[in-house]
Amino acid sequence: MANISSDELGIQPIGKLLVKQSVPAAIGILVMSLNVLIDSVFVGKWIGSIAIAAISVVLPITFFIAALGMSIGVGGSSIISRALGAADREKALKTFGNQITLTFVMTISMVILGLIYVNDLIPIFGAKGSIFEPAKIYYIIILYGVPFLAYTMMGNNVMRAEGKPKFAMNAMIIPSVANLFMDYLLIYVFDMGMAGAAWATTTAYFMSFSYVLYFFLSKNSELKINWGHLGFNIPILKEIGSLGFVTLARQAVISFTYLLMNNILFNLGGEAMIAVYAIIGRILMFALFPVFGITQGFLPIAGFNYGAEKYDRVKETIYTAIKYASVLGSIVFLGLLIFPEALTSLFLSNRADLPAEDKLVNTFVLEHTPNAIRWVFAATPIIALQLIGAAYFQAIGKAIPALLLTLTRQGFFFIPLILILPNYFGELGIWLSFPIADVLATIVTGLYLRKEIKATLV
């Protein structure tokens, strides 16, 4: 789990290197996912299941704004990995400076717009009925912390591009631990309700940003923050935009999917159905952390070796990553198949003073969520090919294939399915949409990746 120099990405054995890169990323994602999971448990236990639903409808908006930082980070880091692989340090430094400037301009602009149109935005994403007021409270406070989260996401990708996965892991662990402490203090001790949950998360975002800033000002980073490299370089911006647009488009589609899902679910079962989906979303983030960790670890290795024209190592990286992630995905599936009831119960409060509406929602959630979990995660053993395949094209700087493969699952398959299947199968149609979309997207990605490997990695 030690940090390595960027040159070692082209030297060390692939299996060992993938573990070194993936384990810190997976631990960071695990801690962050545990943070979201336990945060939701705090909210569910001490505020109520309506509050979980309220947070769920807000997250797609705030995460989309934060994803601007992620997209700039991923797009720029692909350039940085290839530049370091080609020994072009100046281009790497210029790219980093452009990332810093672009993240600031984009996120601040979006936050201002988000605050101005708050009353119009959150109802569109499903904040209706008794969900609206708690969602608005949470949303406004969280927006103040979103720029810090965006910078953390951007910096985290640059750390991995440098071959510093341990520091990237720390950047995710620090805010997660801080958020848990602040949740306990503000929700349980001071009983601040939704405002407490929001301020806890916002404070954690700021702490994460502080650590990332420290890293890039210290001797640990190869890419120092330099005023001379800040600003906009049009060719670099175009490349960041073309590659980062893949990540942004993915988050945009995810946010749009949440919009559709929350509205369809509200029409089917009101606030209770949104609460079911909110719990599944929390479990999804937590359960797939090892697969996402391998995907993150895969990116800098593939990008560096492609830039260094070591194509045999690139192929080995692809196959090894898919194999490791598939095994871990199968283990995750078995766990969710066996213990869905226990996982659902974690989020539900048994407080005697719980409002009657929350008690009714709890009963509904406990009855409907376990079966939904089994369907939603049914294709987990095969999603590794889908994720690694799309990530590969992003790593090597091929923006169009990366974009199309990224949109395949959500945009081309899942959204049409959730618009069609509920008309015939009701609630079950929603949950069936998940594994069907996964299977179809995996087939398409596998065929395209196979064609690309035969054509270019020779």
Regions found by a protein language model. Name each.
Residues M1-S22, I80-G145, V189-G244, A302-A379, ...:
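Short alpha-helical transmembrane segments in multi-pass integral membrane proteins
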Residues L9-W46, P60-G75, I79, F104-V111, ...:
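N-terminal transmembrane alpha-helices
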Residues K20-D39, I141, P175, A204-S208, ...:
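Transmembrane helical elements of multi-pass membrane transporters/channels
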Residues V23, I27, V58-I61, T101-V105, ...:
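Hydrophobic residues within alpha-helical transmembrane segments
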Residues L34-I52, I122-G129, L185-M192, S255-I280, ...:
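Helix-terminus/linker motif at the lipid-water interface of multi-pass membrane proteins
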Residues L37, W46-S49, A83-A86, A161-E162, ...:
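Helix-loop interface residues and adjacent transmembrane-helix termini in multi-pass membrane transporters
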Residues I52-I112, L149-A168, V276-P340, I383-A402:
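Small-residue-rich hydrophobic transmembrane alpha-helices
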Residues G73, I142-R160, A168-S176, A197-V212, ...:
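Short runs within selected transmembrane alpha-helices of multi-pass transporters and secretion channels
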